[in-house]
Regions:
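Helix-loop boundary and gating motifs at the non-cytosolic
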Residues: 2-52, 210-248
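Symmetry-related core transmembrane helices of the 12-TM Major Facilitator Superfamily/SLC fold
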Residues: 165-182, 365-383
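Intracellular juxtamembrane helix-capping segments at the cytosolic ends
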Residues: 111-128, 313-326
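Interfacial helix-cap and linker-helix signal at transmembrane-aqueous boundaries
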Residues: 32-33, 63-64, 141, 156-159, ...
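Juxtamembrane intracellular "pre-TM" segments in multi-pass secondary transporters
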Residues: 1-4, 184-217, 237
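C-terminal ends and interior cores of transmembrane alpha-helices
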Residues: 79-94, 282-295
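Hydrophobic core of transmembrane alpha-helices in multi-pass small-molecule transporters
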Residues: 15, 84, 95-114, 218, ...
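Helix-to-loop junctions at the C-terminal end of transmembrane segments
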Residues: 55-69, 158, 258-272, 358
């Protein structure tokens, strides 16, 4: 069994990383606005995170799998992120071009953290049956806690200090991330440099079960883009109070935390593909409910409770399936494909399409589209399960 100390180190990395992301994504637009940037420019800067996720995670993971040092690569990327955050704090008053350059560098560096830490943690949690999903949930929960603590505390702190202090808080969180990355155990997380598997990552991706799995990931996460990018705006247009909007987000993150912590108690009740189908199916109903009941906080709260299944259960099942399909030297690149196809490409497509839909048909149309995409994700998950069974050796 993996000792608690390495798992605690991974939990600390995820706490600080998601704290940094939560702080930046929530309050950076306010800082940019204080610098005199237009809403169009601020929106463009915000979209850079999705654009960099299309290539950066796979690039970092390819490098780590080739040099055989995932943790060391993660540490270098964390150091680069700290340099980018410091440069952003200093360059803020100097012009838009410098701000954009620093943000791009920051997001590119961040692209290493999730796939490399996920792959390294999976190495520590490997069992004869695959990934130990119960212990994985106990570690992953710290990322959710870091996010909600940073967003809540950041609001109170910036209320007192003023938004001008924002970039220095970002610097502090990325300094903490580097410190935690330096504490990660690296001695048992190496693959042979330049080791070549019998098949490459892209060859694995072309297998029907894997291709349908990633198609399901893409459409299910694409459906969630309606939530991440447009939920707050939708409720604001409907006249809901800012406190109510914050409460709705708190409900979602709260049930996410509960699921991750206790997932070992019920995760075995379905197959991994069964969880994918359940998550996408529930998401189909969830986003239809948001479209229909935006004026009812009670019903909206019920839809937010399903975040435990549509995000937390879906994510845990995805990580376990990637662990199964991409072993050994391919593991980091498998995690990177998840980041790229699931959260990079889907974020770009969802942001652009959602913007067009909301502009011409209103925000409710965005959530109806999200419901439709989730239904497609469920069908893709069913196809993935079919091909997985077909490829399994006969008993």
């Amino acid at each position: 069994m993996t000792p608690a100390r390495p798992l605690g180190a991974f939990g600390a990395v995820w706490f600080t990383y998601f704290a940094a992301i939560g702080l930046f994504n929530t309050y950076a637009p306010l800082w940019f606005k204080s610098l005199g940037l237009s809403l169009l420019v601020i929106g463009g800067i915000a979209s850079l995170q999705s654009w960099t996720r299309v290539l950066a995670p796979y690039g970092w993971s390819w490098l780590a799998d080739r040099n055989g040092q995932r943790i060391r690569t993660l540490r270098w990327a964390s150091a680069l992120a700290l340099v980018a955050a410091l440069a952003l704090a200093l360059a803020g008053p100097l012009g838009t071009a410098l701000i954009v350059a620093c943000v791009v560098l920051l997001f590119v560096a961040n692209g290493a953290v999730v796939p490399l830490s996920e792959a390294s943690l999976a190495h520590h949690l490997h069992t004869e049956r695959g990934l130990d999903t119960a212990r994985y949930g106990r570690v992953r929960v710290w990322g959710s806690l870091g996010f909600i603590v940073a967003v809540a505390a950041g609001g109170f702190v910036l209320q007192g200090t003023g938004v001008a202090a924002f970039p220095w808080f970002v610097v502090a969180t990325f300094a903490a991330l580097l410190w935690m990355a330096l504490r990660l155990p690296a001695s048992h997380d190496t693959v042979r440099p330049h080791a070549r598997s019998e098949v490459g990552a892209l060859q694995v991706l072309r297998r029907p079960a894997v291709a349908w799995f990633f198609a399901s990931v893409f459409f299910t996460v694409l459906a969630h883009t309606s939530l991440y990018a447009f939920f707050s705006l939708y409720l604001d247009v409907l006249g809901q109070a800012k406190s109510a909007i914050g409460l709705m987000w708190g409900v979602a993150v709260g049930v996410e935390i509960v699921f991750f912590w206790f997932q070992g108690r019920w995760f075995e009740r379905l197959t991994l593909h069964g969880w994918l189908v359940a998550a996408a199916g529930v998401a189909t109903l969830r986003f239809a409910g948001v479209a229909l009941f935006g004026n009812s906080l009670g019903l909206l709260a019920l839809t937010q409770l399903t975040h435990a299944v549509t995000f937390a259960a879906h994510h845990a099942a995805c990580i376990a399936l990637i662990h199964r399909h991409f072993p050994g030297a391919l593991r980091a690149r498998g995690q990177a494909l998840y980041s790229t196809l699931g959260y990079g490409l889907s974020g770009v497509v969802g942001g652009l399409a959602g913007g067009v839909l909301s502009e011409h048909l209103g925000f409710a149309a965005v959530f109806w589209a999200g419901s439709a995409m989730a239904a497609v994700g469920a069908m893709c998950a069913l196809r993935a399960a079919h091909h997985e069974r077909a490829a399994a050796p006969a008993p």
